[in-house]
Amino acid sequence: MRCPFCGNGDTQVKDSRPTEDSAAIRRRRFCPACNSRFTTFERVQLRDLVIVKKDGQRSAFDRDKLARSIRIACRKRPVDEDSIERIVNGIQRRLESSGDTEINSKAVGELVMEGLRGLDPVAYVRFASVYRNFREAKDFEDFVETLGGSAD
């Protein structure tokens, strides 16, 4: 693995262990050229996934982008990074095991909503407000009412 700091192609693995959900291998690496340490993750990729957006545009599935959008919804909420990683891993596994190589972006959004609903209700509403394109306060009220909560 090439060092991200100096570009040296000869780095050493100092520690290797599975992640909490065993979906990846976490490796601590050391670069003897610049004495830097960095972490890498090794994951199984069953197939290359392509996301089909609303306008028909296609792009490669990006798990980092998915994690970023979930982190934004969870910002300043009592949600730890491991919980976010579990949601991302679960979504990626479901998409890969679906048998389809092209996935509609709407399906990904619904999976994120499903994951956030069980994790944090505020993060769930935040994500829904962007995903479902809420335009006014009434949209929030209507959505919260479907959750069984009161908008008052």
UniProtKB/Swiss-Prot annotation:
Basic and acidic residues compositional bias, start-end: 12-21
Aminoacyl-tRNA synthetase found in the keyword field: no
Cofactor(s) required for function per UniProt: Zn(2+)
Location of the ATP-cone domain: 49-139
Record's keyword terms, sorted: ATP-binding, DNA-binding, Metal-binding, Nucleotide-binding, Repressor, Transcription, Transcription regulation, Zinc, Zinc-finger
Recorded GO MF terms: ATP binding; DNA binding; zinc ion binding
PROSITE patterns from the UniProt entry: ATP_CONE
Residue intervals of every unnamed zinc finger in the record: 3-34
Protein family: Belongs to the NrdR family.
Function of the protein: Negatively regulates transcription of bacterial ribonucleotide reductase nrd genes and operons by binding to NrdR-boxes.
Protein name: Transcriptional repressor NrdR
